Structures are given as structure tokens and as C-alpha cells.
Amino acid sequence: MKGADLDLLGANFREISNAQKEQLDIRHGLEVIKVNNGAMKNAGITKGFIIQTVNNQAVRTIEELQKAVKEASVSKEPVLYIQGIYPTGKKAYFAVSLEN
């Protein structure tokens, strides 16, 4: 179950470190550590981007991201609205379609 939900996104993630939290003045997030072909790449999300919220829900762990993907994929509108920040401090927003 764990891999299957996130395979759709085509990216790998890790929880951010305390140093990243301090540097960017944020409390939580998941860093995109690799982007392959898939929904994330199609939306323009790149390696290094830190996901903070998905569909207005805070994302602190890979499990929370997984839950958001699962809920969105079975909804009427299978889209992830992602808010986050780049290591430069620039904020960004993406809409990631989960439809094939």
C-alpha cells in the first residue's frame, strides 16, 4: 500500500531536518529528494522543493502525504493542491492532477 499510492506521484520524499526548519523558519514539511516521470514532474515540481500542505492539510510525514493522496484519488476532483517552499525561501503553489 505504501509505495503504490506514492508511485503515482513519481517522486521520493524525506522529512525535513531541524536545520532546514530553522533556516527556512518553518515547522514541518517533506522534501522532494528525487523526481521521476509522473504527476509531480508534470506539475513542475522539482528536487529540493519542500511540501508543507496538501489540500489545506499540514504534511509532516510520508504517511500524511500518502493519506492525502489516497483521499484525493477517490474524490470527485482527484487533484492535490500543494503549498510549499524552495530552499531559497521562495514559496510556491502547485496543482497536481492524479488522473492518468
PLM feature spans:
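C-terminal recognition in membrane/secretory proteostasis and scaffolding
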Residues: 1-100
